[in-house]
């Protein structure tokens, strides 16, 4: 399967957008694997006093397992990435990173409550929230909520999340490149990424919690559309996001059938 996506996030710090190309393979009904590469387009707000940047991010690979059960559905994935992005632009931590994620859910008619928990050495981006920074340091991440099936192609997700780091943390800004001074004045609401390119500190530096809302629409089998909102409580940051995804294998496979 070949998949192309374009995602963006906008808040008071500016806009972060990602064009991602990926390829995946399903070995059977339970196991799959994939690789991909993102390209970032970052446009900081005028308050940071910095210019827009762009470039390739970290190449990543994922292995995934999924098991459906009448009692409880479970999926797990392990993603690793190499430091191919430019850390001076905030496109990489300069280190190899991993993320182990686990998800449990159960269908109750139109409601599908879920719990998502994982461990990583870098805060993972989500479809709701492309953070204006990347991080390096061990952490656990949690999300719980429910998917609501509004129709056969429209769904709403409501959830809360928590980022729980431990030990030394390094925060690398995507809106203040290396060599730039960033926002003048002191750090507000813990947003060190507005003032300097790189900050190292304790777990409180990257600790975060908040709420998400996401509306997903799939008008065609090969087309996925998303519109999301995130409120970061720790950083007092409101973000609006969008996503457009195209399953190229499904799209071109359908076109071949039409030609025949």
Feature-to-residue mapping (PLM):
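Residues on the lipid-exposed face of transmembrane beta-strands in outer-membrane beta-barrel proteins
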Residues: 21-25, 35, 61-65, 78, ...
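Residues that define the transmembrane beta-barrel architecture of outer-membrane proteins
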Residues: 13-19, 53-59, 92-98, 134-142, ...
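Surface-exposed loop and membrane-interface regions of Gram-negative outer-membrane beta-barrel proteins
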Residues: 33-64, 168
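Extracellular loop and loop/strand-boundary signature of outer-membrane beta-barrel proteins
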Residues: 6-9, 45-51, 85-90, 127-133, ...
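Transmembrane beta-strands of outer-membrane beta-barrel pores
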Residues: 1-7, 37-43, 67, 80-86, ...
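Strand-connecting loop/turn motifs
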Residues: 26-30, 69-73, 108-112, 149-153, ...
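Short glycine/proline- and aromatic-enriched beta-strand/turn motifs that initiate or cap beta-hairpins
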Residues: 1-25
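Outer membrane beta-barrel transmembrane domains
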Residues: 136, 141, 145-260
């Amino acid at each position: 399967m070949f998949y192309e996506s374009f995602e963006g996030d906008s808040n008071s710090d500016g806009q972060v957008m990602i064009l991602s190309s990926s390829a995946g393979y399903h070995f059977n009904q339970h196991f799959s694997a994939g690789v991909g590469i993102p390209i970032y387009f970052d446009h900081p707000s005028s308050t940071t006093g910095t210019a827009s940047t762009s470039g390739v991010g970290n190449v990543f690979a994922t292995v995934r397992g999924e098991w459906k059960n009448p009692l409880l559905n479970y999926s797990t994935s392990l993603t690793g990435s190499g430091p191919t992005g430019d850390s001076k632009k905030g496109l990489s931590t300069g280190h190899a990173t991993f993320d182990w994620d686990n998800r449990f859910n159960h269908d109750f008619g139109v409601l599908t409550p879920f719990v998502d928990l994982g461990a990583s050495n870098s805060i993972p981006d989500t479809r709701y929230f492309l953070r204006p920074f990347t991080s390096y340091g061990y952490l656990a991440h949690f999300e719980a909520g429910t998917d609501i099936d509004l129709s056969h192609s429209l769904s709403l997700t409501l959830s809360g999340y928590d980022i729980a780091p431990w030990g030394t943390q390094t925060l690398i800004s995507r809106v203040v490149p290396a060599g730039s001074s960033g926002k003048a004045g002191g750090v507000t609401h813990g947003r060190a990424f507005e003032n300097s390119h790189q900050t190292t500190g304790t777990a409180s530096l990257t600790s975060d919690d908040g709420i998400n809302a996401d509306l997903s629409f799939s008008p065609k089998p090969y087309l996925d559309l998303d519109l999301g909102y995130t409120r970061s409580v720790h950083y007092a940051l409101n973000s609006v996001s969008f996503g457009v995804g195209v399953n190229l294998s499904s799209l071109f496979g359908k076109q071949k059938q039409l030609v025949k």
